[in-house]
Swiss-Prot record:
PANTHER family associated with the record: PROTEIN CRUMBS (PTHR45836:SF13), SLIT HOMOLOG (PTHR45836)
Task performed by this protein: Essential signaling protein which has a major role in germline and embryonic development; involved in cell fate decisions that require cell-cell interactions. Probable membrane-bound receptor for putative ligands lag-2 and apx-1. Upon ligand activation, and releasing from the cell membrane, the glp-1/Notch intracellular domain (NICD) probably forms a transcriptional activator complex with lag-1 and lag-3 and regulates expression of various genes; targets in the germline include lst-1 and sygl-1. Involved in the specification of the cell fates of the blastomeres, ABa and ABp.
SMART domains from the UniProt entry: ANK (SM00248), EGF (SM00181), EGF_CA (SM00179), NL (SM00004), NOD (SM01338), NODP (SM01339)
LNR repeats: 496-532, 536-577, 581-612
Annotated source species: Caenorhabditis elegans
Domain of life: Eukaryota
Extracellular side stretches: 16-764
Annotated compartments: Cell membrane; Cell projection, Axon
Protein name: Protein glp-1
Cysteines engaged in disulfide bonds, as pairs: C23-C35, C29-C46, C48-C57, C121-C131, C126-C140, C142-C151, C158-C169, C163-C178, C180-C189, C201-C206, C220-C229, C236-C248, C242-C257, C259-C268, C275-C286, C280-C296, C298-C307, C329-C342, C336-C347, C349-C358, C373-C384, C378-C394, C396-C405, C411-C422, C416-C431, C433-C442, C450-C461, C455-C467, C469-C478, C496-C519, C501-C514, C510-C526, C536-C560, C542-C555, C551-C567, C582-C595, C591-C607
């Protein structure tokens, strides 16, 4: 045991603590350790003080070590152990152990000869473990559950384990144990532990509950609801929450009542004395009306709201026209109305009435010439502003509100912005701002002087004076460390799989149980087709905290949608008494200061005063509101959107008027005839006239523009997509029902498309013209078909690519502009969310446009995070399965009609009738039988097909889409019919207009049974790697799709001769050629099972496509977490760069997958660290492994086994060089060969790497040895951990 501790004292600093870098950099080691530069260049290690351990001495050890010992951790940061303290001198152990020994000798006394070259592992002595040779012997490192000198002892105890579902059984020598997933505990992981799942219930508490599918439930705090208590409860929906005609406003986790004057309290239930501060002049006195409003009773001879107007001498009354010399009311001279009383000849009215005889309702009466600021109506030091023909408006100071600023404001959770705390002192509120913010409401973010307040923890100080923090840090100077709860994300992600959210995704229905960021918001069904948090550094965290009433600074940025505006004060509402006034004056060119703030839409930008502004246009939203209602309330709707976005919002327009269209639930219809003059009077129309327009629950489709008055570097929204994402995130919070307080169902960025048809043409004229054009086109097509004849076996269309030239800057700019002509964010509520549902449009559809719709989509569709995926190039035809273009034939041919119908055929079946051709679809009877969708039984279809074949039907006849009956049978999953057609000579190698054969159709349909039958045809086996129009083989099509039998189908194709790493090289001259293999497509679609199968079959993990991207790069770009982890942990190269000189980590970062980028950098750093350790070990003669090890002496001598070059059986790859003849000293560079490629470090796959695992151990220390074996039989299987090459030294021993 003492020997073991001595060994650990030497080995721990060498193996587990050698890092890349130098001691000179800040924070190389923590304050609990001292840094020493390593023997190798740019390496260092940390010597820890007593009581501390870890690679950087950052962890405090809780073991009570004896005197002369200290505590360390193993290389995994676990298993603390007491070892001897370091020697007093500061000489690194690597130098102490190597001093004085001659070359070829080592050991404490420099007398031990080093490795002689005999390979003792040739006989494979380790039964259930790995054999590692060294001088004079070998060591066996046993697998879990096995022991003994030769790993011969032990059994698999996991065969009959009782571990709960989701846990992992780990075998040991005498038993097994269950490795529990996050949130589970117990011997068999049978218990749910809420404490292990982090803050899984955001605003509530977690309670174990076996009746739930997740085995726990959340009990929400007051004001919150939802499965995970992350949704605000709208208390205002409860009847009479606020009383006395007050207005209820929902807040996050709470609500507030805006009381009518005269009432106070949380529910406005308390009547207050409004006369206390209400002064009536000239001996008038104050009273309350029925609404608790203060009114003044004036002495005769005075009038006015506060008795401030003196009437001419001898006159009185409210108009100063009542003679005071004679009584005005009496029994004979008239009475007082509305319960007024006649006192001393004049009427004294009830508080709600006024007039000389109390005949006027007070609320309908206005005193003459007093609705202006000259009478000082505003109180509490408010600023009064006269309104043109509308009276006045009071701008209240902090802490007051109301018509005349007479009401005191109460503190609410959202009174102060950016996490400030509100406190009320003597009726006046004050915001205490956090560090980095200032202003009355903490609404101003202070700029930092970088020289005085440098950014910490790796943050970067920008020109704006703000710090851009690294992942895991936040705060004005990045001083705060975030606690990222991976356990919570893991639990929810597992829940998504358990609920089969992938099957429910993109079906047009928002399923609340899948409305989580980890479930992609039900495939976009709950987010209007968007991925709103795709750019956010903390997507799951910020989606969870979005609009929850708590300011989270790490989410308070444009990429994370400003935390749902939680960090902004909610006091910005347009006062009711000037709301109409401000709507009428928005954007009229005159600055109305009373309207120039957030709540009233910044007066339409009129108070800009030359300040810079940014205008974001082409924001397309669908709103479930009646078009007629919107015609009347357009200005009010725009005001509401403006207030919620905190920016000016206007409707775009073109030369025909406002861009407002009807929406029938599926398509964008005709333009809504808005009253342009009225809207212009309201100034809710854009100032910019667009010269073209576009078209896609009923309602309207609006095209909006958002104007923000700001300098560009300080604007909240830099792109229109950010506004769309904010709207989409609001949809998420309501399960897809509304956003911005409106019933919005979808938002996207879309440029209205130019309407090429003359607006003056009628609909019937357009249809007539289209029909004529179609008939002419059909005649030409029929002539071509008749000329070429039906005897061709295939139709292949080769597209020759133009010669590529380096794009100029102007060309790139033009390309970016033109990109807007395709689609922004395709709606996931549409069937064409990711691809068109039909494999090919029928020939009759060409006249009506794509899918028969009037409008096209604008920006590239996305596969993952809101950025164009690799399937979205303009020339990529992403297509799926197809169906018959019509239920019934166009011609009334009896045999065709009966073949396509539900009943059996009764018409005569003759050689002439079975070969009769439909004039429109060019189909024959076999086509209609194979494509029958009318419910005809399968056995009847097969029997009738046999009868037609016997009558002489052409089995290989093709319709206008070049489809044979076999292709249609394959699409319809008709196995029996497919077998009959094959037996009768159907050619499965014929290609249709989509350039697909029956093989492609079968794999697209995921039909394993038909695939097995097709692969019995020898003609098809010879063309098993044929490409479709997108340059994809059947294996590639299988690899990209998820499904129950996909892996089995891929294995079947490979067993029948499909090439594993074929990249479509036969189409290199085509613009469809991408240079990708099946592994590329499996990786980019996160098909983990397929990736595992292909990698195990030795598919080239580092094959680069035409863009220089490897499978792991494509997976990183699309955010495929599981695939990236598997490839990275199975030695896929992380140092290769693509044509843009970007590594996999940089590709992930550019696509806003920050966590993936951090993971890839961690793995790359670990590899770099372990490579340095191995080199150090090799130089010092040490290479031990952890585990149960046994050393046996080998007395026989022998010659060294000559290393042989591993012959590669892969396809030749023009971008991926072959191994350098087995040399481990100078591997071929595996990166994209561009003129600017300057990778810091070459990296190769294990097949081409020097095998450091063969470094030979000796009995005492490690010494320099000759080059080790390069025998693939003794390769170490990479473990499933990020520390895949790390070596655990603590606990190892040799005998």
């Amino acid at each position: 045991m003492r020997v073991l501790l001595i060994l650990l004292a030497f080995f721990a600093p060498i193996a587990s603590q050698l890092m890349g870098g130098e001691c000179g950099r800040e924070g190389a080691c923590s304050v609990n350790g001292k840094c020493y530069n390593g023997k190798l260049i740019e390496t260092y290690w940390c010597r820890c003080k007593k009581g501390f351990g870890g690679a950087f001495c950052e962890r405090e050890c809780d073991l009570d070590c004896k005197r002369g010992e200290k505590c360390i951790y193993d290389v995994y940061g676990e298993n603390p152990t007491c070892i001897c303290q370091d020697c007093e001198d500061e000489t690194p152990p690597t130098e102490r152990t190597q001093k004085g020994c001659e070359e070829g000798y080592g050991g404490p006394d420099c007398k031990t000869p080093l490795f002689s070259g005999v390979n003792p592992c040739d006989s494979d002595p380790c039964n259930n473990g790995l054999c590692y040779p060294f001088y004079g012997g070998f060591q066996c490192i046993c697998n879990n559950g096995y022991g003994g000198s030769y790993c011969e002892e032990g059994i698999d105890h996991c065969a009959q384990n009782e571990c709960a579902e989701g846990s992992t059984c780990v075998n040991s020598v005498y038993n097994y144990y269950c490795d529990c997933p996050i949130g589970k505990s117990g011997r068999y992981c049978e218990r749910t532990e809420c404490a292990l799942m982090g803050n899984i219930c955001n605003h509530g508490r977690c309670i174990p509950n076996r009746d739930e599918d997740k085995n726990f439930r959340c009990v929400c705090d007051s004001g919150y609801e939802g499965e995970f208590c992350n949704k605000d409860k709208n208390e205002c929906l409860i009847e009479e929450t606020c009383v006395n005609n007050s207005t209820c406003f929902n807040l996050h986790g709470d609500f507030t009542c805006t009381c009518k004057p005269g009432y106070a309290g949380k529910y406005c239930e308390e009547a207050i004395d409004m006369c206390k501060d209400y002064v009536c002049q000239n001996d008038g006195y104050c009273a309350h009306d029925s609404n608790q409003m203060p009114i003044c009773y004036c002495e005769q001879g005075f009038t006015g709201q506060r008795c401030e107007i003196e009437c001419p001498s001898g006159f009185g009354g409210i108009h100063c026209d009542l003679p005071l010399q004679r009584p005005h009311c009496s029994r004979s001279n008239g009475t007082c109305y509305n319960d007024g009383r006649c006192i001393n000849g004049f009427c004294v009215c009830e508080p709600d009435y006024i007039g000389d005889r109390c005949e006027i309702n007070r609320k309908d009466f206005k005193f003459p010439d007093i609705q202006s600021c000259k009478y000082n109506p505003c109180v509490n030091n408010a600023t009064c502003i006269d309104l043109k023909n509308s009276g006045y408006s009071c701008h209240c100071p902090l802490g007051f509100y109301g018509l005349n600023c007479e009401q005191h404001l109460l503190c609410t959770p959202t009174t102060c912005a950016n996490g400030g705390t509100c406190e009320g002192v003597n009726g006046v509120i004050r915001c205490n701002c956090p560090n980095g913010f200032s202003g009355d409401y903490c609404e101003i973010k202070d700029r930092q002087l970088c020289s005085r307040h440098p950014c910490k923890n790796g943050g970067v100080c920008k020109n704006t004076g703000y710090c851009e923090c690294q992942y895991g840090y936040t705060g004005p100077t990045c001083e705060e460390v975030l606690v990222i709860e991976k356990s919570k994300e893991t639990v929810i992600r597992d829940l998504c799989e358990q609920r089969k959210c992938m099957d429910l995704a993109s079906n047009g229905i928002c399923n609340p149980e899948c409305n989580l960021e980890e479930c992609n918001f039900d495939g976009g069904d709950c987010s209007g087709g968007q991925r709103p948090f795709s750019k956010c550094q903390y997507p799951a965290r910020c989606a969870d905290q979005f609009a929850n009433g708590v300011c989270n600074q790490e989410c308070n940025n444009e990429e994370c949608l400003y935390d749902g505006l939680d960090c902004q004060s909610e006091l910005f509402r347009c006062p009711a008494h000037i709301r109409k006034h401000c709507i009428e004056r928005r954007g009229d060119g005159v600055c109305n200061l009373e309207c120039s703030f957030i709540g009233c839409g910044f007066d339409g930008g009129d108070c800009n005063n030359g300040t810079e502004a940014i205008i974001l246009s082409d924001i397309r939203i669908k709103v479930q509101i009646d078009p007629i209602e919107f015609q009347a309330t357009g200005g009010e709707t725009l005001m509401q959107i403006s207030a919620n976005l905190r920016a000016t919002v206007r409707i775009q327009r073109d030369e025909l008027g406002p861009l407002v269209f009807r929406w029938d639930g599926e398509h964008e219809m005709e333009r809504v005839e808005m009253n342009s003059s009225k809207l212009e009077d309201q100034f809710v129309l854009s100032h910019h006239v667009r010269r073209y327009r576009q078209a896609v629950v009923t309602g309207i489709v609006l095209y909006l523009e958002v104007e923000e008055i700001c300098k560009p570097e300080f604007c909240r929204f830099s792109t229109a997509q950010s506004v769309v994402d904010l709207i989409a995130a609001g949809l998420v919070k309501s399960d897809g029902r509304m956003s911005l307080g409106l019933p919005i169902t979808e938002a996207m960025v879309a440029v209205p498309k130019r309407n090429e048809i003359d607006e003056g043409w009628s609909r019937s004229q357009v249809i007539l013209f289209a029909c004529i054009a179609f008939l002419a086109f059909g005649t030409v097509v029929a002539g071509v078909i008749a000329k070429n004849g039906p005897e061709r076996s295939r139709k292949r269309k080769m597209v020759n690519a133009t010669v590529w030239m380096p794009p100029m800057e102007s060309t790139n700019e033009k390309g970016r502009r033109n990109q807007s002509n395709h689609s922004s964010q395709c709606s996931l509520l549409d069937n064409s969310a990711y691809y068109h549902p039909n494999t090919k449009r029928h020939c009759s559809d060409y006249s009506t446009g794509y899918n028969g719709e009037q409008y096209s989509q604008i920006y590239p569709q996305t596969l993952a995070n809101g950025y164009p995926g690799d399937y979205n190039e303009l020339n990529f035809d992403f297509q799926s399965e197809t169906f018959a273009p019509a239920d019934l034939p166009a011609d009334e041919i009896p045999l065709h009609v009966q073949a396509a119908g539900p009943d059996a055929i009764t018409a005569p079946i003759t050689n002439e009738s079975v070969n009769q051709v439909d004039s429109k679809y060019r189909r024959r009877v076999l086509h209609w039988l194979a494509a029958n969708v009318r419910g005809k039984p399968e056995d009847v279809i097969t029997t009738e097909a046999i009868r037609c074949l016997k009558a002489g039907a052409d089995v290989n006849a093709r319709d206008c889409d070049e489809n044979t009956a076999l292709m249609l049978a394959v699409r319809a999953h008709r196995v029996r019919l497919s077998v009959v057609l094959l037996r009768e000579g159907a050619n499965p190698t014929i290609f249709n207009n989509s350039e697909r054969s029956a093989l492609h159709e079968a794999v697209v349909n995921k039909d394993l049974r038909i695939l097995r039958h097709l692969l019995t045809d020898k003609r098809l086996l010879k063309e098993i790697d044929e490409l479709d129009r997108n340059g994809m083989t059947a294996l590639m099509l299988v690899a990209r799709e998820l499904g129950k039998h996909q892996v089995e189908m891929a294995e079947l194709l490979l067993s029948k001769g499909a090439k594993l790493d074929y990249d479509g090289a036969a189409r290199k001259d085509s613009n469809k050629y991408k240079g990708r293999t099946a592994l590329h497509y499996a990786a980019m679609h996160d098909n983990e099972e397929m990736v595992i199968m292909l990698v195990r079959r030795s598919s080239n993990k580092d094959k680069q496509d035409e863009d220089g991207r490897t499978p792991i790069m494509l997976a990183a770009k699309e955010g495929c977490e599981k695939t990236v982890q598997y490839l990275a942990l199975n030695d896929a190269s992380l140092g290769i760069v693509d044509s843009m000189d970007m590594t996999a980590a940089q590709v992930a970062e550019a696509s806003y997958h920050h966590e993936l980028a951090a993971f890839l950098r961690q793995v790359a750093n670990e590899r770099h660290r372990n490579d340095i350790m191995r080199q150090q070990i090799v130089k010092s003669g040490h290479g031990a492994k952890s585990g149960r090890q046994t050393v046996k002496n080998i007395k026989r001598a022998g010659s060294r086994k000559t290393p042989t070059s591993a012959a590669s059986s892969r396809e030749t790859n023009h971008l991926t060089p072959p191994p350098s003849d087995g040399s481990f000293s100078s591997p071929s560079p595996h990166y994209y060969p561009t003129t600017t490629s300057t990778p810091n470090r070459m990296e190769t796959s294990p097949e081409y790497m020097f095998n450091h695992e063969m470094a030979p151990p000796v009995n005492a220390m490690w010494y320099t040895t000759p080059p080790p074996y390069q025998d693939p039989n003794y390769r170490h299987v990479p473990p499933n951990t990020a520390f895949q090459n790390a070596e655990q030294m603590n606990g190892s021993f040799y005998c």
